[in-house]
Amino acid sequence: MNCSVNMVGRFRKLLAIAVGALGMIAIASSSFAAAANRADSDAVVAEAEKLVMQAGQSNPPNIKLINAAMDKLRAAIRIDPRNDAAYVDLGFCYTVMRDGKTAVDMYRTATELNPSGNNFIELADIYLRVGDPEDALLAANAGIVKDPSNARLYNAKGLALNDLHRLGEAQEAWEKALRLDPNLKVAQANLDALNSGQTGRGSVGKHPPQPAGAMH
């Protein structure tokens, strides 16, 4: 009797080990598939960005190329629905197409998928472009929580505060940006404009372009 009980116990342990191993294999397989999907999706995003760069070589931008880029970005999202870079680039394309509402939706989705400092900079920027400094300030502050050493987030915060006519706070934000990055020329230009009395839309500059590899 004891022998039978022991055999049953060992069988159950072996079964549990086998089930656990299968689970680990399934997780590893799923992770591998997700990584492969992201790589394929990123490759399509890169193709789309080349089209956007080509579109920007004409003035006004070549809308046919922008539409082609948007088709590729949608394809990238179908491959990997969590590719935040595709949503960021779609937001840029909708901005070029002067569809601010949809652009905001794209940038907001990017922050939901990946709440990085850079994505919140993009969201703050589009809010500023559509004349919504309140939400721009919220986006900048959310980004600062995620990336407190990002000077460009403080520059975006300063822009939002400037548009809200909270000039003292805008000055503090730009000074903070310069402490974090003394070479952030746009923050210095914004601070100089504020100190010279040039306030309001059009007297301060947007955040600077992203590093090489980004679209804007």
Model-inferred region functions:
Residues 55-56, 77, 111, 144, ...:
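A conserved position within tetratricopeptide repeats
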